C-alpha cells in the first residue's frame, strides 16, 4: 500500500520540489496587499515552508506596486520584531535589489544552512512613500536531517565487478519510507542494466560505459501541517557511478636500449600508461626483484599533464645496469606491472657534415649519416656551438673540449632527423667565428661527434660578394654581344 501511495504522490511531490509558484497566484493572495512571497517547496494555502535541516533556503519578497518604496522600507523581520539585514549573521541575512524584468523592489531572505532552531514566523514588511504599511508572514518548519543508509554520493568498483546503490533511509520505527529510484534525468532505471530489489539497485558486472550513469534516490515524507493536511517533503540524493580500471600499458613488455662506453651517459627507462582510472598516483621500479630507491644514481620522474607515465633515469649507466626492470603503476584502487628489458646497443656513427652556406646571422649545414646498417634508426641531430674565443679559453684543442665544458658554455639545440639533412642555425653574430659540434642520436643515446669551425659574414665579406656579382654582369653582357655577332 505504501509503494502504491508513493507512486501516486511522486509526480505531485516532484512538481512541488522543483518549482516555485508566486504567492500572488495562490487562492489566498490578497489583491490589496502588494507583498508577494515565494519560495521552493512552499505551501501557498498556509504560507508554510517545510525543509530539511542543513539545506540552503531562499525566500523572496517582492513589493508588486507602482507606488514608490525606498529600499530601507522593505524589510524582513523575525518573530521577536528584530530586523534581518545584510549584516544580521553569516547564516541568516537579507539582500535588497530590483526584481528582474521590472522596477519592483525585492528583498531575499537567505539561510546558508537552516537549523531546527530557525523554525518560526518570518514577516516581510513594506512602507510606501505615502505612509501605507503592508506585511505578510510565512511559517518556516525545519525537519530533522534525513539519514541515508549510505551517505556516499560517489560509488565505484573495478571494471567487471558488481556495484550496488542503496537508496534506503533510516526512518522512524514502524514508518515505511516512500522511495523512488531514477536516473539523473528523472526517468526509471534501465532494467537491462540494473537489477532492482527493494531500495537497492545493482549492476552485476561494471563496464566502462557505466561510468556516465547517475542514480537519483528520492524520498517522500508526508508532513502534517497545522491545518491537519499532509504536505509532501521531498529529499533527493544523486549517486554518481565510477568505474575503476587497472593501469593499462600499450604492451606488457618492451625492449629499451642504452650505450655503454667511456662517456658518462644516462639511460632512460620509460613506463608509459595508456589508460587508468583513477589516474596512477604511485610508480615503483624494480631491477630484478630489488626495489630501486632514489639516489645519486637513480631518479624517478612522473609525467605532469594529460599523459600518464613515469621514467627511471640511471646516471652513468654501466654493464651492471643491464637486464630486466619492472614498473609498478598504482592508482590506489588497483596496480599493474610493465616489464622492460634494458639492452646494450652501438652508438650512432659520427655524421658527415658539410657547410652549405654562411650568411650574416646564420649558417646552413648538411648533416648526413654514413652508417648504412645501424643497430637503431637515427631520431635526432644534436648541434652545439660556442664562440671561438670561448673555445680557446678552455685551454685545449677544439676536439678535446670536454662534455662538461660544452654543456656549460655552448648553445644547444636538438633537431629531428630531416630527409634532406639541411639545418639552418640562426641568431649568430655577424663576422664571428664559432666552433661547432655535431652528433647523431638514436634510442640508445648519442654517437661520436664531429667538431668544425665556421664564420659568419662581416661587412667586408658582403662587399666582396656584391663586387663579384657586379663584375659578372659586364662579362655576361660582352659574351652575349660576341655571340650575337656570329649569328
From Swiss-Prot:
Residues 34-139, 247-354 form the Ig-like domain. GO terms for cellular component: axon; plasma membrane; side of membrane; synapse. This is Neuronal immunoglobulin domain-containing protein rig-3. The lineage of its organism: Eukaryota, Metazoa, Ecdysozoa, Nematoda, Chromadorea. GO terms for biological process: axon guidance; dendrite self-avoidance; homophilic cell adhesion via plasma membrane adhesion molecules. Gene3D superfamilies: Immunoglobulins. Disruption phenotype: RNAi-mediated knockdown results in hypersensitivity to the acetylcholinesterase inhibitor aldicarb, indicating increased cholinergic transmission in mutant animals. Residues 467-487 form a propeptide. It is a lipid-anchor; GPI-anchor. InterPro entries: Cell_Adh-Cytoskel_Orgn, Ig-like_dom, Ig-like_dom_sf, Ig-like_fold, Ig_sub, Immunoglobulin_dom. Disulfide bonds join 61-124, 271-327. One of its GO terms (molecular function) is cell-cell adhesion mediator activity. Expressed in the cholinergic motor neurons AS, VA and DA in the ventral nerve cord and in the mechanosensory ALM neurons in the midbody. It is found in: Cell projection, Axon; Synapse; Cell membrane. Residues 1-23 form the signal peptide. Keywords: Cell membrane, Cell projection, Disulfide bond, Glycoprotein, GPI-anchor, Immunoglobulin domain, Lipoprotein, Membrane, Repeat, Signal, Synapse. A lipid is attached at residue 466 (GPI-anchor amidated aspartate). Cell surface protein which plays a role in the plasticity of cholinergic synapses at neuromuscular junctions and in the polarity of the mechanosensory neuron ALM, possibly by antagonizing Wnt signaling. Pfam families: ig, Ig_3.
